Amino acid sequence: MNKNLSLKLAPRSKIDGVIKPPGSKSITNRLLLLSSLCNQSISLTNHLISDDSKYMIKALEDLGVSISSDTKDKITIFGDPKKFNNSADLFLGNAGTAYRPLCALLSILGGNYRLDGVERMHERPIKDLVDSLSSIGADIKYLKNIGFPPVQVSDFKFNGKTDISIKGNISSQFLTSLLMAVPLIGQDFKLNIDGELISKPYIDITIKLLKLFNVNYINHNYSSFEFNCNDNPKLYSLDSGLIDIEPDASSASYFFAAAAISGNIRVEGLSKESIQGDIQFLEVLEKMGADITYNNDSIDVRKANTLVGGQFDCIAIPDAAMTLAAMGLFTSSPLELFNINSWKVKETDRIVAMENELRKFGATVTSTENSLKIIPPANISDNVSVHTYDDHRIAMCFSLACLANKSVEIQDPECVNKTYPNYFNDFLKLLS
């Protein structure tokens, strides 16, 4: 990847057309991991092909899992945790959806595993997850800074403790990692959540997929989860060997937003019944004035007569909230986002990054540890060069600025390879 590259987006005034974004990153990486735990072959269609999913696939292959790409849109996993290699050196880039779940899984399976990533991964906290796993007998050592990757995972010595606690207000990936891994202990178990649970819709994805894989649990209103793993011969098995993955709702948010700003878009493959939390972004767009139509297998968004601002709780849509922030350049009144503290531990500190880049376009921006307020500019600045911080979502959300009929330069556009390698090609085809 050449980080010195940039992409110049010409001034545009409208977006129009039909698009089907690639498969959901959150669903793809969860399914890859869960499929590797099944003693059967499982095929996934419409899976995401991106840096994050490639890191997960490579790690699973390094662990001894056989994975074949049958066609461009279909992949088959031949899993069995009993056949995992006893040692491996895994490099996981900046893929939190791979690093954290694999850390939990391998610490319970036991063995000799080193988990590393890029420099930004070394800054993303993992201490709460490690502390929870260590409390039941996991042996995890920090190789550089305490509380952060890289880590070394060694043999698991289960101490008989049948409950575990995890903080809910740091990252939902910690809870997701435990939810997918603790059933491997093979006995009844309880997971307790301390404090408020952020990004709850991402937990909903996890528990719905666990049900699919015959993992039995009781959800006590998201304050705790009880697993019933004794005498469950179907644990980590799938009744059907084929799963079709729905398009990524976070990736769809850029097209939904573009239409609300200036145009008409139909996104295929998604419906109101999507299991992804970012589908709730459409409710925000409706409040801002956009016209939304839900079809059986597609969603239409049409331009708002006036795109209004407002105050929005983003706890359920942390990724789509990035798109919402970029829309603050176009609103007729101030836009305020709150409950976005999870932004600080993502690919970059997104609160700082968004504040910096929005100001380049002329917006007045203030922030706290948990909120961002945007007062739109009277005139959006032309020829702005957007620094993307190696963050795919910053690159994609600021592409919307060209719809102000302004030129926009996106630095390091290939950072979108993390979740949507063809984003700019797809976006440009729809512009007029």
Descriptions of predicted regions:
Residues 1-432:
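Structural preference for solvent-exposed beta-strand-turn elements
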